[in-house]
Amino acid sequence: MWIKSPGKVVQQRGPETRTQAIRRAALELGEELGFDGLTTEGIAARTGIAKTTIYRRWPNVGAIVMYACLVDVTRLAPIQTRATARESFTASMRLLGKAYRGRLGKILRPLLGRAQADENLREAVRTRWVEPRRQAAREAVRRALQSDELRAGLDPDVVLDALYGPFYHRLLVPYKNGVISDAFIHALVETVFSGLEPSGT
């Protein structure tokens, strides 16, 4: 099987489905050109797959990139389950932070920005990306409430906003020393959990 690349044709390494080829090309081109430079035509040229074939599954380049990012984040940063919720969130967020410090973050920032003005893309991000991961995190908070790691009566969604709000602020708003580092994640989780522990803990 052969894959066309701009200016040349290269033999593909190992078996790869059309979906995998499209996902890989979207991530590679997103890293090379940035989100604004991505086009369905470019992905078609990189993969040698007809645009009509691509459009049968994805309506636009934003949908392709979102799918590619979703697969990547699921692979690179699966939800972690550890002995305590504090440890689980620290481990999960460190994996996510590592992914966002690389290619994924470079592509995801403009994608999330575009979603604010694109209702279809925004809904896709919410239903396919945010809600599935948030639901898993919500369950982790509920377990923490049941095990008295967190004080009773807390709203799980508010706890998640306290944890992930600063995380995504650093992803989307560039400022000096605003890196999503392991040290930042450790300090963030410790600060949130220390402030929400039952009295006397």
Whereabouts are the PLM-identified features?
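Basic, helix-initiating cap at the start of DNA-binding domains
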Residues: 1-48, 52, 63
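Helix-loop "lid/cap" segments that line or gate small-molecule binding pockets
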Residues: 94-100, 108-117, 171, 189-195
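Hydrophobic alpha-helical connector segments
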Residues: 77-106, 159
